[in-house]
């Protein structure tokens, strides 16, 4: 989009007592990102009078925050039943070690002591499953490193402790991690999963506290962390 507001061509619609209009943006570019066939709006149960003029306004609000060269979701991913969703706010998370907010490496399961093989797969990526499927992914170690280098300070949002990144644009709640024994360790520290594996069944993650934010690889595949997804 080259402007904040764009007007479409005028289309003729035959009047009916009750009809549904579908608006689909087949080609859409915002900034340097393509969103082709991603936006569809249905206006159902509408009545149109003969000779009338009507205007339908579609407002597009971004569901991501661009920091450090990546677009980050506005909330952590969580599992509920067999489905995956984003929290309604950046500070939100599901409490409890198996409440749906902690994931081992390379697995869709939020249960304790679960992980996938040594090659990270989209089929095992909780972010990849969020509708529309294939839009998001777990960040790489470099993407988390870039987020940490974008400017960090500890703080709180909505009463939840955590860290701000990129000039207060991205907030990650500090939730600690879930050990193999189903214990929530270091709840005042932030640990966020990457898709990048390390040696000996370890993996990279972003760790932050009141003093620093660094990329680390101390923990194992089966140690569960929260995930903040990025756009693919």
Functional labels for PLM-detected ranges:
Residues 76-80, 91-95, 107, 112-113, ...:
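C-terminal, surface-exposed recognition/capping segments
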